[in-house]
Design a protein with these regions (language model features):
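Active-site His/Glu-centered metal-binding helix of metallohydrolases
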Residues: 50, 54, 58
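A short glycine/serine-rich beta->alpha loop
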Residues: 32-45, 73-78, 143-147
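Glycine- and Gly-Pro-enriched alpha-helical subdomains that act as flexible
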Residues: 57-100, 111
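Polyampholytic, low-complexity intrinsically disordered segments
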Residues: 16-21, 25-35
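C-terminal edge-of-domain segments
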Residues: 149-168
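Short, conserved loop-to-beta-strand elements that form functional interface hotspots
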Residues: 103-148
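General beta-strand structural signal in soluble alpha/beta enzymes
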Residues: 7-11, 135-138
């Protein structure tokens, strides 16, 4: 007898405008891109839209709400927090609820800086925090809207989680024990 895994998909999105603070660091997917020709993003934590989108996707798949519910921007303990640490905490919350990450896929939308040279390192750092493979893609808004005018950066993410629903699987194609 085998146990049938349960699967859940979560979606996340995060958007931050560029900060007016010239000293603000730009962190995306855990990679510090300060000095790449743009300022940092405005936000309570380090404003890493990539880590935030993946965190929201994990929480959504696990049925645990969103990042703001667990780590509100009104709480001083999250001020300038490392978003990879936040992602690790989210993964722990999901694990406590019986879930583990299978993989994640995300798309960063930014006119600048140029992200192609950094996506592999982002994927590596994010995978370390998530405990599962992460694919990172970058695209541009091609001049359309606030993102196209380079007023900020956005990221969308999808995460697959697996858990154990405790039911015995029987029958062909359903994990039959022979």
């Amino acid at each position: 007898m085998t146990v049938r895994p349960r699967l859940a998909v979560g979606q996340g999105i995060d958007v931050h405008a560029f900060s007016d603070d010239p000293a603000r660091r730009l962190v995306l997917g855990g990679v510090d891109l300060t000095g790449e020709g743009v300022g940092g993003l405005a936000g309570h934590s380090d404003a890493d839209v990539v880590a935030h989108a993946i965190s929201d996707a994990v929480l959504g798949a696990a049925g645990l709400g969103d990042l703001g519910r667990h780590m509100p921007d009104t709480d001083p303990q999250w001020r300038d927090a490392d978003s990879l640490d936040l992602l690790r905490q989210v993964v722990s919350l999901a694990a406590d609820a019986g879930w583990v990450a299978v993989n994640a896929d995300c798309t960063v939308v930014a006119e600048r800086p140029r992200l192609a040279p950094h996506v592999d390192r982002m994927a590596e750092l994010l995978a370390g925090a998530l405990g599962a493979p992460v694919n990172v893609k970058a695209t541009r808004a091609e001049g359309l809207g606030a993102l196209g005018r380079a007023e900020g950066i956005a990221c969308t993410a999808v995460v697959l989680l697996s858990g154990d629903d405790g039911t015995a699987a029987r029958g062909p194609g359903d994990g039959e024990v022979r």
